[in-house]
């Protein structure tokens, strides 16, 4: 609630206030260095806001996919790395075992017994993502997931919340249902729909990012592009 954050003298997030609904999948966009990753880290509790408060419900389980893969034990076998978290992940279709999940992520049965140190950088990234998903989060924070997270894999989350930083237009159009855009002075503007809907809304208003930057020197006042319906306490986390 009313969260602000300044880093190294730069106001990155200015009086941000939002209640996340159960079914929301939020895409955070903006220029490099504007505060997108900072916002995710505050949501995960890795850093604290300078003012305001982030409230997290008692039943929330957060999974956080950072931009960089954390250190791994290179001697550990792929299947062991995943089973350290869980033997299976529950879905509406039933339990999916760690081995089955690995196959979904392109690790065939033989590869599952490969030492982690033998994996390529991309394979380690996929393995890291799977480990986050095996924790069965109901809120998933993704910092530039790139091509590692395909659309079918998102079904594992079922009705969970997704908050993602991404520059991938296809991903944003197919995964998110609301865009949060950094538009200057630490302000976030919210738009209903995916990235194409965001562009269309900007065009309708006659205020593309380039035009607004020229007119206002990159400073945009905070607003919500589409009115939000009143939220029930039961719908929020």
List each language-model region with its residue ranges.
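ABC ATP-binding cassette signature C-motif
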Residues: 1-237
């Amino acid at each position: 609630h009313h969260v602000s954050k300044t880093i190294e003298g730069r106001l990155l997030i200015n009086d941000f206030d939002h209640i996340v609904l159960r079914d929301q999948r939020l895409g955070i966009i903006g220029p490099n260095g504007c505060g997108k990753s900072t916002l995710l880290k505050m949501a995960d509790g890795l850093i604290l806001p300078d003012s305001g408060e982030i409230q997290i419900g008692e039943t929330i389980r957060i999974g956080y996919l950072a931009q960089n893969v954390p250190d791994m034990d290179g001697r550990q076998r792929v299947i062991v790395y995943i089973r350290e978290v869980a033997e299976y992940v529950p879905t509406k279709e039933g339990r999916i075992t760690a081995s089955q999940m690995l196959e979904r992520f392109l690790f065939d049965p033989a590869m599952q017994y490969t030492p982690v140190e033998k994996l390529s950088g991309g394979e380690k990234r996929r393995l890291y993502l799977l480990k986050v998903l095996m924790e069965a989060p109901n809120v998933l924070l993704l910092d530039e997931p790139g091509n590692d997270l395909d659309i079918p894999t998102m079904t594992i989350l079922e009705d969970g919340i997704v908050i993602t930083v991404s520059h991938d237009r296809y991903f944003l159009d197919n995964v998110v249902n609301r865009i949060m855009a950094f538009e200057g002075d630490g302000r976030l503007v919210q738009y209903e729909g995916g990235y194409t809907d965001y562009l269309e809304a900007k065009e309708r208003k006659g205020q593309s990012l380039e035009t607004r930057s020229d007119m206002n020197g990159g400073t945009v006042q905070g607003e919500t592009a589409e009115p939000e319906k009143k939220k029930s306490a039961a719908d929020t986390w």
